[in-house]
C-alpha cells in the first residue's frame, strides 16, 4: 500500500503565502461589504446531518456529498452547500426575528467530483440571503450588493446573467412531455446544445406542438440585453410566460437604474435546477475563468421543507474563482510587498521589537530579523523580495524599495 502522508486528496490544495493573503483579504472585503449594507453574518457547522440535505428537489445529488458516521451510526456530511443550513437556522432559531431577514456567510463547502476532472472539491463561498420577502426588490438587492462587493475587490470585467425558470416551466406546461423527457430537453438547452435541441423537438413535435416548439427552439439563443425580453414576448402568448418575462424586465430595470446595468445580461436559456429555484435565477462569469463566479436565485419552497414556509432569495460568490480572475495589478494591491525587516545587534534586541511595534502601529508590515549580522539580513530580504530593512542600531532604513523589492 502506498504511504500517502506526503500527499493531499484529489480535488484539494494547499494555499500558500501570497495566495493565502490575497484570498483572506478578498473574504474580508466581501464580508465587510455585506455588513455595511445591513446583512448579519452567520456561521453553520462544517458537519451537518445528511437529513438536512435529503430534501425534495435538492440541487446537489447525494453522490456529490462526502459522508461519514458519528459515534452512534448517524450519517453526517461535509456541507456541500451553504444555503440549506441557512434555511435550517432560520426555521429553527430565527422565527421570532423581524423580517425581511438579511443574512451573510463565508465558509467552505465540499463536493465530490469525478476522478481526474481537475475540479476543486473544497470551495470557499461568500454569500447573502434575504428571507421572508417576496418582492422583486429583494432579488435586485442581492444582485446589486454582489456587484458592489465584487467591484470593491478590484475585479471589473465580469457579468451577471439573469434567468427565469418560470418562463421555461410555463412553456413546458403547454406540452405533453413527460418529466424525464423535459429533463433531457432542459439539459440540452442549458448546455446550449443547439443541434440536440432541434433534434429533440423535431422528434417530439407531436407532443410539443407548433407554438411551444418555436419558443423552445429559440430558447438557447435568447441571450443578451433587454431586447431579449421583447424577442421572447413575440414568440408566445402564454400568460404565465409573459408574467415571468415581466419580472425579468422589472429586475433588469431596477439594477440598471441603480447604476449597474453594464454588469448584467439576460439569458432565458439558463434553466438549471428548475425544481429547486422558483423564479429568477442568477449566474456570474468573469474573464479568464471557466467556472461560475457566482450563482443563486429565488428558492421560495426550501424553508417550507424545514417547517417554516417563507420566501427567500440569495446568491453565493465563489471566492476561489474570484481570486483566480484578478489581474496582476489588483493582486499587487492585495498583497503589499512594502515590508520591513528590522535588524538589531544582540545587545540591542529590545530596540528591534520596539521598532516593529511602532511600524505595526503605523499600519506597516514588519518583522524582526533573526540573523546576527546585516549582510545575512540583506540576503534574506533579496531572496524574499522584502522591500526595506530598518537598522534599529542606527535608526535608519538602509535598503531602498526599488532595489530590494525586485529579485
From Swiss-Prot:
Q: Tell me a GO cellular component.
A: cytoplasm
MF term (GO), any: transferase activity
- Location of this chain's protein in the cell: Cytoplasm
Task: Say if the entry is tagged with keyword Cytoplasm.
Answer: yes
For this protein, the record's Pfam families field holds:
tRNA-synt_His
Metabolic or biological pathway: Amino-acid biosynthesis; L-histidine biosynthesis; L-histidine from 5-phospho-alpha-D-ribose 1-diphosphate: step 1/9
A Gene Ontology BP annotation from the UniProt entry: L-histidine biosynthetic process
The signal peptide here is none
User: Keywords in UniProt for this one?
Assistant: Amino-acid biosynthesis, Cytoplasm, Histidine biosynthesis
Per the record, the major location class is cytoplasm
- State the oligomer form and interacting partners: Heteromultimer composed of HisG and HisZ subunits.
In the record, the note on similarity to other proteins reads: Belongs to the class-II aminoacyl-tRNA synthetase family. HisZ subfamily.
- List the HAMAP family: HisZ
Q: What this chain does, per the record?
A: Required for the first step of histidine biosynthesis. May allow the feedback regulation of ATP phosphoribosyltransferase activity by histidine.
Query: Under which name does UniProt file this protein?
Result: ATP phosphoribosyltransferase regulatory subunit
Q: Which organism is it from?
A: Clostridium acetobutylicum (strain ATCC 824 / DSM 792 / JCM 1419 / IAM 19013 / LMG 5710 / NBRC 13948 / NRRL B-527 / VKM B-1787 / 2291 / W)
Q: Which gene encodes it?
A: hisZ
Amino acid at each position: 500500500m502506498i504511504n500517502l502522508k506526503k500527499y493531499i486528496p484529489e480535488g484539494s490544495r494547499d494555499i500558500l503565502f501570497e495566495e493565502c493573503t490575497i484570498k483572506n483579504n478578498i473574504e474580508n472585503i466581501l464580508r465587510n461589504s455585506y455588513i455595511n449594507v445591513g446583512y448579519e453574518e452567520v456561521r453553520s457547522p462544517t458537519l451537518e446531518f445528511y437529513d438536512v440535505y435529503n430534501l425534495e428537489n435538492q440541487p446537489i445529488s447525494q453522490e456529490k456529498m462526502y459522508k461519514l458516521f458519528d459515534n452512534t451510526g448517524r450519517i453526517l456530511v461535509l456541507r456541500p452547500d451553504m444555503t440549506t443550513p441557512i434555511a435550517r437556522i432560520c426555521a429553527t432559531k430565527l422565527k421570532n426575528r423581524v423580517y425581511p431577514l438579511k443574512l451573510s456567510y463565508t465558509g467552505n463547502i465540499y463536493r465530490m467530483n469525478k476522478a481526474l476532472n481537475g475540479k476543486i472539491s473544497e470551495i470557499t463561498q461568500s454569500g447573502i440571503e434575504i428571507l421572508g420577502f417576496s418582492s422583486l426588490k429583494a432579488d435586485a438587492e442581492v444582485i446589486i450588493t454582489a456587484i458592489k462587493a465584487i467591484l470593491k475587490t478590484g475585479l471589473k470585467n465580469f457579468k451577471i446573467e439573469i434567468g427565469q425558470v418560470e418562463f421555461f416551466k410555463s412553456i413546458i406546461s403547454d406540452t405533453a412531455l413527460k418529466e424525464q423527457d423535459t429533463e433531457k430537453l432542459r439539459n440540452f438547452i442549458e448546455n446550449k446544445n443547439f443541434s440536440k435541441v432541434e433534434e429533440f423537438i423535431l422528434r417530439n413535435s407531436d407532443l410539443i406542438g407548433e407554438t411551444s416548439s418555436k419558443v423552445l427552439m429559440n430558447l438557447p439563443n435568447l441571450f443578451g440585453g433587454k431586447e431579449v425580453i421583447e424577442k421572447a414576448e413575440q414568440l408566445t402568448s402564454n400568460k404565465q410566460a409573459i408574467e415571468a418575462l415581466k419580472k425579468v424586465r422589472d429586475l433588469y430595470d431596477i439594477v440598471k437604474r441603480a447604476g449597474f446595468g453594464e454588469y448584467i445580461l439576460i439569458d432565458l436559456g439558463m434553466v438549471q435546477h428548475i425544481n429547486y429555484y422558483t423564479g429568477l435565477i442568477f449566474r456570474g462569469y468573469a474573464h479568464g475563468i471557466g467556472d461560475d463566479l457566482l450563482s443563486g436565485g429565488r428558492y421560495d419552497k426550501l424553508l417550507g421543507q424545514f417547517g417554516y414556509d417563507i420566501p427567500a432569495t440569495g446568491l453565493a460568490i465563489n471566492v476561489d474563482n474570484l481570486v483566480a480572475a484578478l489581474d496582476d495589478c489588483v493582486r499587487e494591491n492585495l498583497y503589499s510587498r512594502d515590508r520591513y525587516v528590522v535588524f538589531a545587534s544582540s545587545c540591542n534586541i529590545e530596540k528591534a521589537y520596539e521598532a516593529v511595534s511602532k511600524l505595526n502601529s503605523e499600519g506597516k508590515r514588519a518583522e524582526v530579523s533573526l540573523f546576527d549580522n546585516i549582510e545575512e539580513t540583506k540576503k534574506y530580504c533579496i531572496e524574499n523580495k522584502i522591500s526595506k530593512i530598518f537598522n534599529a542600531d542606527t535608526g535608519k532604513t538602509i535598503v531602498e524599495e526599488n532595489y530590494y523589492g525586485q529579485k
